[in-house]
């Protein structure tokens, strides 16, 4: 079944010698405070999607907040299918524990009900709870009557983080009124709000925001620039071309990648935006050090090649001498952009994936029919399946002979494609399809059977009623949706209580996975508490060597790399499906998610995000995070890169290290606040999320003297710095904005040995980072080293300045 989606190097920041090999982060031994049997029973309820009123009622009223927290999450997983649990979640929304309220909000969003409860939670005194409630409200966007109240939050929320979250998910409302609110957010003084406004507009084109988006192309925030670039490309106005061309020279590959894609969108609308004078920049970007940027430029090069011989020669050169991935993309670009009489001269001796790109590019072209006939009997099932996939729906009758011949193909994915295309012919043989539903029961994969069922559903859905009780859970779901069944059992549950207990015991220990590739290693921390069944399934497959000699068969620049398919064509799986374990984890950079083709269809395919992808939150199970290998391996991975093996628990865990920091850059030398916010992942969001105690800042104000200043020695690569420096940046902003106090600061980024830059760090005795040194004139008043002593950063700062 085709699965689609829509570095921190862990060393202690105090270490002065070269860091040891990376070790994975630890998790608490018993993070939920539940017995093995209790947790196992909840896993069983989730598997069965069973709303056991007695058990749920007891846990909702349980004196232990850990029980209430766990049942709040379970209600969302069960209710997403059964639409039950809303009253219980309404009760939990008033819980004294903020985590319970936050999870209740999340679960109501997963169910898609409980608007009034969510609006109440959106006004919660805890910003984290309120933000989660706002995100959940956006999942109720089918009810347009809720939009005015949602817009009030997006425009006026008092807490910056809550407003930013509301602005982010304006995209889900699919409404110009919501897009206009996103446009208004682009003018916010808050960097986080501007970023989320640009993100919302990057997901839905809105021409009314064009001018504001152009201004954001030079914003200091990398994500804001990247999102604005995509948004302008989706609008497709030629007036944005110069700004997009200039963005090819941006300092960050995310922006350059998005600029290349955006230029392609403009060129698709009108070739007149292209100018031969731009070719030096185009050629330079085609040799970018980032693999995703290079890949994204190939189609752009194809547009120029339509009119320019030099560009054409460059495209041919990439076909001959590029990497495997680049040669595949070049074949598609040549087939798409050049006359077939010329393209056919160079598109010879193609690999199967090159043929796939050519078939995709020529699907709607006159010569596409002949190409499909030529490749219909190709030896590789990847090619045969893509021949069928690229038959236009309106042209199925003309190629019915290819379709019918494929009905008896030896490969199940090819047969699936044949049944699917058969549904677009003028004379659909329903009996043939009904026979296939039965004959395909014994196939190693259910794709062909599902394809036949989907075609039957178009014209004879009632006949599928018996399949609502089919042994295959995915067949049950598809059939139930077709006949509008009120309820069905989502999964066949064959696990015993002892097996659930085994999963729980395993999940209570920290676990790691090492993806060994020819390109290098990717180190994962498995989120065995947040997604125990998914993480367990992944680990068991790895131990069975299931992933050996697979590849990352799908790479989308600045989005994801996807692997886990032994067929290496995005259609393979282990022959079974596991249920979703949607959780509160977010798709930030380096998140590891389970690829799906519908609810509860996960198996073995997984993906890793290059950059934040908030639209995936709450839709795909996150079961791991990269803690080493992002910049050096994930970012450079190309389609087809081989996975040698995946090893479980190859590295022992190390306690007290956060796994939320991914691929932090290593910079050395003087830094500015703007550069920190734009270059280091999560700094801007962490600054936004931190809310200093205003009374402490007010007390601090009279103690800050003229001539006071602070030197901050920090590591852009360091988790302690990433935790503490954004707090300090927020305090500086609030002192300036609310109390008119300017406190000069010098930021110095040091290397891991704390020896560089030698001229700035000499004599400072910096042994740990982050180190904040407060001076009055030339005299040091005190310093904050690595961790604050008080719960609030501003308390430690007040202690120093009040000396």
Describe the residue ranges of each PLM region.
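Amphipathic alpha-helical scaffolding segments comprising HEAT/armadillo-like alpha-solenoid repeats
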Residues: 24-26, 49-61, 80-94, 112-123, ...
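Residue-level detector of extended alpha-helical repeat arrays and alpha-solenoid scaffolds
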Residues: 38, 68, 101, 130, ...
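Short inter-helical turns and helix N-cap capping residues of alpha-solenoid HEAT/ARM repeat scaffolds
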Residues: 63-64, 96-97, 125-126, 158-159, ...
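Structural signature of alpha-helical solenoid repeat scaffolds
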Residues: 76, 109, 138, 171, ...
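Cyclophilin-like peptidyl-prolyl cis-trans isomerases
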Residues: 413, 431, 438-661
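Thiol-based oxidoreductase modules, predominantly thioredoxin-like and allied folds used
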Residues: 713, 741-756
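Structural micro-motif
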Residues: 764-775
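Non-catalytic, surface beta->alpha helical segment in thiol-disulfide oxidoreductase systems
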Residues: 777-803
């Amino acid at each position: 079944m085709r699965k689609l989606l829509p570095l921190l190097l862990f060393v202690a920041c105090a270490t002065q010698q070269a860091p040891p090999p990376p070790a994975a982060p630890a998790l608490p031994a018993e993070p939920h405070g539940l017995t093995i049997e209790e947790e196992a029973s909840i896993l069983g309820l989730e598997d069965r999607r069973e709303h056991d009123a007695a058990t749920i009622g007891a846990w909702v009223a349980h004196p232990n907040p850990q029980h209430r927290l766990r049942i709040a999450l379970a209600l969302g997983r069960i209710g997403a299918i059964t639409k039950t649990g809303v009253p219980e979640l309404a009760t939990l929304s008033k819980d004294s524990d903020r985590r319970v309220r936050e999870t209740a909000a999340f679960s109501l969003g997963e169910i898609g009900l409980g608007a009034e409860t969510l609006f109440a939670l959106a006004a919660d005194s805890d910003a984290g709870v309120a933000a989660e409630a706002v995100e959940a409200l956006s999942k109720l966007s089918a009810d347009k009557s809720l939009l005015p109240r949602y817009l009030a939050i997006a425009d006026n929320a008092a807490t910056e983080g809550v407003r930013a979250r509301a602005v982010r998910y304006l995209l889900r409302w699919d409404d110009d009124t919501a897009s206009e609110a996103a446009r208004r957010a682009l003018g916010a003084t808050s960097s986080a709000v501007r970023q989320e406004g640009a993100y919302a507009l990057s997901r839905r084109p809105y021409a009314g925001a064009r001018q504001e988006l152009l201004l954001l192309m030079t914003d200091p925030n990398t994500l804001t620039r990247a999102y604005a670039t995509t948004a302008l490309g989706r609008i497709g106005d030629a007036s944005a071309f110069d700004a997009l061309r200039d963005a090819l020279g941006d300092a960050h590959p995310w922006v350059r990648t998005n600029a290349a894609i955006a230029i392609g969108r403009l060129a698709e609308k009108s070739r007149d935006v292209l100018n031969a004078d731009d070719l030096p920049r185009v050629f330079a970007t085609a040799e970018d050090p980032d693999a995703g940027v290079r890949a994204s430029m190939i189609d752009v090069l194809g547009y120029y090649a339509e009119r320019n011989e030099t560009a054409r020669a460059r495209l041919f050169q990439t076909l001959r001498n590029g990497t495997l991935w680049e040669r595949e993309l070049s074949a598609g670009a040549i087939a798409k952009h050049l006359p077939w009489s010329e393209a056919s001269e160079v598109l010879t001796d193609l690999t199967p994936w090159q043929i796939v790109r050519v078939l995709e590019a020529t699907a709607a072209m006159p010569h596409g029919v002949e190409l499909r006939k030529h490749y219909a009997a190709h030896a590789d099932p990847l090619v045969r399946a893509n021949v069928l996939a690229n038959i236009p729906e309106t042209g199925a009758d003309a190629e019915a002979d290819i379709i019918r011949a494929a009905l008896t193909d030896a490969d199940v994915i090819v047969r699936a494609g044949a049944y699917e295309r058969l549904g677009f012919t003028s004379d659909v043989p329903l009996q043939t399809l009904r026979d296939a539903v039965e004959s395909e029961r014994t196939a190693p994969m259910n794709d062909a059977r599902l394809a036949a069922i989907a075609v039957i559903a178009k014209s004879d859905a009632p006949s599928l009623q018996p399949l609502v009780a089919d042994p295959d859970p995915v067949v049950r779901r598809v059939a139930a949706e077709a006949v509008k069944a009120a309820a069905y059992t989502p999964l066949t549950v064959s696990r015993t209580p002892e097996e659930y207990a085994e999963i729980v015991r395993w999940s209570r220990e920290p676990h790691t996975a090492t993806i060994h590739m020819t390109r290098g290693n990717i180190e994962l921390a498995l989120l065995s508490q947040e997604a125990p069944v998914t993480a367990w399934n992944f680990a068991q497959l790895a131990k069975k060597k299931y992933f050996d000699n697979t590849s990352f068969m799908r790479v989308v620049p600045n989005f994801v790399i996807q692997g886990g398919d032994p067929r290496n064509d995005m259609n393979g799986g282990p022959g079974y499906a596991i249920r979703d374990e949607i959780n509160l984890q977010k798709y930030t950079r380096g998140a590891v998610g389970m690829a799906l083709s519908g609810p509860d269809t996960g198996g073995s395919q997984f993906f890793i995000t290059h950059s934040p992808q908030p639209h995936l939150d709450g839709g795909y199970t996150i079961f791991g995070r990269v803690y080493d290998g992002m910049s050096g391996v994930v970012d450079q991975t190309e389609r087809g890169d081989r996975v040698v093996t995946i090893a479980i628990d190859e590295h022992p865990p190390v306690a007290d290290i956060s796994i939320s920091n991914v691929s932090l850059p290593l910079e050395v030398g003087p830094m500015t606040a703007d550069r920190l916010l734009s270059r280091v992942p999560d700094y801007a969001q962490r600054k936004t999320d931190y809310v200093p105690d205003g009374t402490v800042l007010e007390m601090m104000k009279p103690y800050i003297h003229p001539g006071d200043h602070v030197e901050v020695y920090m590591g852009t690569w360091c988790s302690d710095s990433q935790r503490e420096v954004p707090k300090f940046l927020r305090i500086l902003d609030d002192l300036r904005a609310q109390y008119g106090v300017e406190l000069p600061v010098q930021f110095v980024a040091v290397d891991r040995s704390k020896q560089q830059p030698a001229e700035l760090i000499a004599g400072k005795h910096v042994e740990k980072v982050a180190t904040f040194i407060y001076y009055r004139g030339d005299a040091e008043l005190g310093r904050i080293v690595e961790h604050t002593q008080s719960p609030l950063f501003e308390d430690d700062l007040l202690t120093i300045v009040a000396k």
